[in-house]
Regions:
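Eukaryote-biased recognition of intrinsically disordered, low-complexity regulatory segments
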Residues: 6-16
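Short beta-alpha connecting loops at secondary-structure transitions
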Residues: 13-14, 99-105, 208-212, 462-465, ...
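A basic, amphipathic helix-loop patch mediating RNA/tRNA/ribosome contacts
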Residues: 28-61
Length: 570
């Protein structure tokens, strides 16, 4: 029975002479994609509705003729009815397949249609390729080579349109480059409910514009730059910074909040130039928020810690790593377990949290917790939990309510019960433990990436690494285990945090430590139930669910509803 049902849901479609089976209701452009037949397009995007206004996806379409009573239908060698081809092309993005349908993407008619569309698009398009940020990833550039005529017949004066227009705090518009695909208009209206973009004027004078009283300022505005097929919309942050073909792309995850959006980090010569969303239909679809996109700037802070230091008088002195590790462990070892507290961060990777737990066991630390940081979330992707690995901290450190012990630690420091404190990855002065309280400590060790107010109080400073400077794993708000990958090296003498924690443990127990992060994950997986039988490589680029949190992603729920309604492909 299941096989029969599946067969009912499938239809036979011929694409460029080859028969394939596709799901009933599939759009022609997606059927061609399954058949590995490219159909060029500008306005079509699987996450948005299809207006069919660019006409670049025109293909030749045919259907079997309807037989007259008693007439025998002629069939081909495969047993399928012969196809009668329509004299006019159809758009592949907005039409769905039917049983016996034929599609030609490489016929003379289809090729002539594409050439004609390309010629119209290029009539008034400026020759900006040498200075355009989209060069190298511009579909107009690519299609003009693959589907264009090769020369222009246009001799008249090109229409001039507005250039370098500020339409929002993060975006510039060049109307001369716009091909009127309306992707940005539909994204703003359909995905983030911010209907501020539209077209005005007519014919060749048609231009994209923003509402006069409301700029494009929502927290997802830079997604319009990603989906713009040309260089009409550019990011102020990336504009004129680097050519795309010089950059290396690293698959990773955003650590700006607990959502864990999948991203591509684009870097060159140990510098990050941009972050863009990477599609994952279980986490962030194909989008990400602007604040997460700009999160990489936290790694460029002028007050970045680059060398280990110890306190000397009123200041700090740079030392080497072996001395720093020894000073930290000797200082902590002077106190009993009940006199030691450890505060970690829910921004640490699972591997780092595992080593922090090992360290706390070795020191017999009386109290261990992580800082809880909450802010504003929204009904799309941004999560109110502003730390990416709270679920990892719960599972590995066995915390029921992360952050609940911070006030207890503060009180016990004031009372003189806690005399030594190790703070990893957080500035606790901003999160509940004030400077006056810290003055009661006998010994303070901190590891951070920035020279903040906490570092000024510390006896030993251990410069760590940012999220793009290390490899590891995290568990997001919905319980999905994902991999964080290293895109650049930590600056100066700063090191990956798991290596620092390894050295602290080795200094205390004298045991040989693991040298590879993958081996560390395997050791952790043997001790953490939710990670059993997992390896770092088995997680893959899209992650795997390991915890049932009951949370859902609002944007994905809305997207699923639109897919069911047939509005988008998804």
């Amino acid at each position: 029975m299941p096989d029969n049902k599946n067969n009912i849901d499938l239809v036979n479609v011929q694409v460029d002479g080859h028969w394939i089976k596709v799901k009933k209701g599939t759009r022609m452009i997606e059927a061609c994609k399954q058949a590995e037949a490219e159909v060029p397009h500008y306005c079509y995007h699987p996450k948005l509705t299809s207006p069919g206004n660019c006409r670049m996806c025109l293909v030749e379409m045919g259907m079997p003729p309807r037989p007259a009573p008693g007439e025998v239908i002629e069939t081909d060698d495969d047993g399928h009815a012969n196809i009668s081809w329509m004299p006019r092309p159809v758009i592949a993005c907005a039409n769905t397949v039917a049983e016996g349908m034929g599609i030609r993407t490489q016929s003379t008619l289809a090729k002539e249609c594409r050439e004609g569309v390309m010629e119209f698009l290029l009539i008034n398009h400026p020759l900006d390729c040498p200075i355009c940020d989209q060069a190298g990833e511009c579909t107009l550039q690519e299609y003009s080579v693959e589907h264009g005529k090769g020369e222009s017949r246009f001799l008249e004066q090109k229409v001039k349109k507005p250039k370098n227009v500020k339409i929002g705090p993060r975006i510039r518009l060049d109307d001369e480059r716009c091909v009127l695909c309306s992707r940005c208009v539909r994204f703003s209206k359909e995905i983030v409910d911010d209907d501020v973009l539209g077209f005005v004027d007519r014919g060749s004078h048609n231009v994209l514009t923003v509402h006069p009283d409301k700029p494009l300022a929502n927290n997802y505005s830079l997604n319009t730059v990603d989906i713009c097929p040309v260089g009409a919309l550019t990011s102020n942050d990336f504009r004129f910074q680097m050519r795309v073909w010089f950059m290396r792309e690293t698959k990773s995850i955003c650590t700006g909040c607990a959502r864990g959006c999948n991203i591509l980090i684009s870097s060159r010569e140990n510098k990050i130039y941009r972050q863009t969303p990477r599609e994952n239909n279980e986490v962030n679809s194909a989008w990400m928020c602007d604040s997460g996109r700009m999160h990489y700037h936290t790694l460029e802070a002028k007050r970045r810690l680059t060398d280990p230091m110890i306190k000397r008088g009123k200041g700090h002195e740079v030392i080497d790593w072996p001395t720093a590790i020894l000073k930290a462990t000797k200082g902590l070892s002077k106190f009993s377990g009940e006199e030691i507290a450890i505060i970690g961060s829910a921004g640490m990777t699972n591997e780092e949290l595992f080593l922090l737990k090992t360290l706390s066991s070795t020191l017999n630390a009386g109290i261990v917790d992580v800082v809880k940081v909450e802010g504003e979330g929204d009904e799309y992707l941004s999560h109110k939990d502003k730390r990416p690995n709270t679920n990892g901290a719960k599972a590995i450190l066995k915390l029921r309510n992360p952050g609940s012990k911070i006030n207890t630690i503060k009180k016990r420091i004031k009372d003189g019960e806690i005399k030594a404190l190790l703070v990893y990855g957080e500035n606790v002065i901003k999160h509940g433990i004030d400077q006056e309280t810290l003055k009661n400590l006998k010994f303070l060790v901190c590891s951070h990436i920035q020279a903040n107010s906490l570092a000024e109080f510390s006896n030993v400073i251990l410069p760590g690494s940012g999220y793009a400077e290390k490899r590891g794993s995290m568990i997001n708000a919905t319980g999905r285990l994902q991999v964080l990958n290293k895109a650049i090296e930590p600056p100066g003498q700063s090191r990956e945090d798991w290596e620092i924690l390894q050295d602290l443990n080795r200094s205390l127990d004298g045991k040989d430590q693991i040298t590879e992060i993958a081996d560390l994950f395997s050791e952790m997986a043997n001790q953490v139930p939710i990670l059993k039988q997992k390896t770092l490589s088995s997680i893959g680029d899209l992650g795997v669910n390991v915890v049932e949190t009951g949370e859902t992603v609002p944007l994905l729920e809305r997207e699923a509803k639109r897919v069911r309604e047939g509005l988008i492909v998804g």
